[in-house]
């Protein structure tokens, strides 16, 4: 299992977009290889038209950065691509030396704010772009989808069932991890239990029932083998005419005489709202009021919400491909942009300009903050400042919309907390990733700090990410400077 044990045992140093190599070689040849640069990762749009994203993938990013090393085979490959010997010598002696900051896993994050910041020699800070985006984009997407589904279930457990339809085995493994962060109770993916401690759950498939001469024999055999965790799949033939009655009979024959109670039955097809109501009545009349009903079958947050609204008697849900692929909105479009460079001992901001206002980047070495109401504990807004600014929460603070600056609000009686923590200092990991159960708990606690309006599935309230006055002024200065250059 070592070969799959998270990122350990796999050298993914060369998992880069090829232009990282061409740029790094070019920086070195132009005498710019040691220029200190600052990059931010951020995203512009929430998947599914939602109100928030859940940060995930930080642990895997740390593992990747700790393991950066170019092998002789890597060097030979790049030599064959025509890169300079000077560049290849640099890679042969490569040692990561950047500072890295990130929002902790399980924290809600919002468009426009820096969620990962990398500071270091331009060759290194540029080189890690692909894996920064890959680690964070994928797991944050799945954690967010899982959290939406969990909230739709209104306290009923959600099990992640999507491994077989994930887009590759890494997507299955890390998707199960991310789904657990988002609030799922467990996974069908056994290797994620081995690697991360995500509880592995599962009982039977239709093939179990089909293999036996009769459905009743199949149920009785399973009940004998797993009396303390007996969940029977009842829709192989006819759920209400044979499946549920045979399950009840198997419970009576195999479990009750041995002092066990049934764990549940599962539906994987049909009109589950209708079937579950009928099955609940049948189970209750047979004395199995404590027998749970599990539903699966291409579910998502909208179907689960509708089923509950229609009176479905379902106690837990198994959710597969629509979770593990986030099929309704399958991409978190995180980007990685240069925001500053050091020159003559000073940090000089850089900006990316576009005709599309939404794609104009925010310059400077920055720090994101979250402002909480002292009385309610609810998040008021996020604030992005220059890195050396301190938000004094003993004083009123004027927030303003960075695009529509006449929209202003003075906040008082609030607590300001920095959003990011330092992961690496001078290339050494200084952050201890918390256990996954703690990350999951942190996620649930932080979601509770968001107003219900932000959590709506449809047309959620726009949670504000504002800029400090100093940062906004610097952005406007750069825009004006570039505007003058264009006129010349």
Where are these regions (language model features)?
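Short, positively charged
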Residues: 80-88, 168, 395-403
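Buried, small/hydrophobic-residue-enriched core segments of structured protein domains
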Residues: 2-36, 45-47, 82, 88-100, ...
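Short coil/turn segments at secondary-structure boundaries
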Residues: 76-77, 144-148, 162, 455-462
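A residue-level signal for beta-strand positions that form part of recognition/binding surfaces
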Residues: 38-40, 97, 158, 335, ...
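N-terminal, Lys/Arg-enriched amphipathic/low-complexity engagement segments
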Residues: 33, 37-92
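Gly/Ser/Thr/Ala-enriched C-terminal appendages of enzymes
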Residues: 2-35, 48-50, 284-286, 299-488
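Hydrophobic residues within beta-strands of alpha/beta enzymes
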Residues: 201, 265, 293, 315-317
